[in-house]
């Protein structure tokens, strides 16, 4: 019994050591721009295109309104204006209310309703690609541009190509930074003397947390990429 307990104690010790080291590395990286660069790489790698698309494919995966879907719809509507002859495809798991809201959002941004098509099947990227290939097989030989979050772009493009689509590019829905001085007068606002003054430390106030969130998104995506690779889906 003592030997078994000793083994478990050693095992837990190593687990906590590894997890602690991993979290420490994540915290250190959050003070650098590496998380942003990794996210940008995922959004741009394998997604470049030089053609005028025949179809713009919006890949949804959240409710409405939501940050993820609204920014993707923003990019989709911008592409729709840039390429007025392209069809618009909303690919989203079957939820008639959410899909209707997405369609209305595009129409609100001056996208002709006659250009909008719906694919309601598919609960993940692989399923969505196969469903679109089956239900709209004419798209297999046409020029596509996918719209999704930056972290999802690499996997999405490769998954659609694996599903048989010949020409697939992507437009990652990147957030744009706000270039404004967000510093403030700590004393003027009544800041207490024993509380640290971070009024001019934008890295700690914003960048650290944003990069920490990017790290989590990228880690989740690399896990998904590994899963798709092991299954031969991309």
Annotated model-derived regions:
Residues 1-11:
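N-terminal Lys/Arg-rich, disordered targeting/topogenic segments
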């Amino acid at each position: 019994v003592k030997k078994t307990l000793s083994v478990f104690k050693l095992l837990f010790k190593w687990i906590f050591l590894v997890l602690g080291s991993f979290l420490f590395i994540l915290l250190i990286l959050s003070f650098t721009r590496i998380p942003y660069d990794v996210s940008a790489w995922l959004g741009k790698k394998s997604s470049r295109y030089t053609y005028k698309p025949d179809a713009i494919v919006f890949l949804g995966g959240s409710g409405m309104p939501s940050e993820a879907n609204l920014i993707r719809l923003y990019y989709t509507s911008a592409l729709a204006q840039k390429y007025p002859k392209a069809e618009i495809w909303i690919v989203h798991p079957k939820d008639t209310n959410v899909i209707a809201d997405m369609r209305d959002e595009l129409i609100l941004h001056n996208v002709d309703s006659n250009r909008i098509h719906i694919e309601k099947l598919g609960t993940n990227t692989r399923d969505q690609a196969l469903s679109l290939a089956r239900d709209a097989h004419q798209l297999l030989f046409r020029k596509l541009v996918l719209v999704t979050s930056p972290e999802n772009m690499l996997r999405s493009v490769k998954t659609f190509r694996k599903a048989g689509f010949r020409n697939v590019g992507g437009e990652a829905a990147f957030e744009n930074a706000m270039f404004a001085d967000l510093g403030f007068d700590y004393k003027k606002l009544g800041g207490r003397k024993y509380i640290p003054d971070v009024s001019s430390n934008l890295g700690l106030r914003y960048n650290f947390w944003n990069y920490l969130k990017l790290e989590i998104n990228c880690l989740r995506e690399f896990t998904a990429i590994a899963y798709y690779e092991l299954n031969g889906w991309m």
